Amino acid sequence: MNTAADASADLDPAPAAVDTVDSSYLQTLVGYNARMAALAVIGHILPGMARFGLRIVDFSILSIIFHNPGITSKQLCGALNLLPPNLVGKIGTLEKRGLLVRHPHPQDGRALGLQLTAEGRALMQQAELAVAGLEAQSTQALTTAERRTLIRLLQKLYLG
């Protein structure tokens, strides 16, 4: 039977207090760096989105619809890697806010196309300008060429 005493016998002597955290191994991983960069950029953008009453996912949904009027929910889920049950509530909320409408799809009678209302289009014109500015601020450590390269490399990872 293993006891706490047996387990502690297997441990090295008690380490000293950690003054500086060593994350050097994690910093060699693409996933860790991509996540940390995403958190930094999103953290900079979130307060700007709040003034429009949007979260990042709301902004992404509205942006895709803005640039693809008539898109179906299925296409939207594919574009944003969302599960259909998660999208249904978001679409309903945005529709109640008067930002989008659903209408019969011209080729598929079972599907509904999504389209922004005039209010939704006006909001997105302002929100996309704001996000572009906020993202420029959060990536100001990069040159224009570095920013383009970073986007291209990230897309290479998730688009294949």
Language-model features: locations:
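Pre-recognition alpha-helix immediately N-terminal to the DNA-recognition helix
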Residues: 33, 40, 44, 60-64, ...
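Short, locally clustered residues in the helix-turn-helix/winged-helix DNA-binding domain
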Residues: 35-38, 63-67, 128, 155
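Residues within the alpha-helical elements of helix-turn-helix
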Residues: 64, 79, 97
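Helix-turn-helix DNA-binding motif, specifically the short coil turn and the N-cap/start of the second
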Residues: 83-86
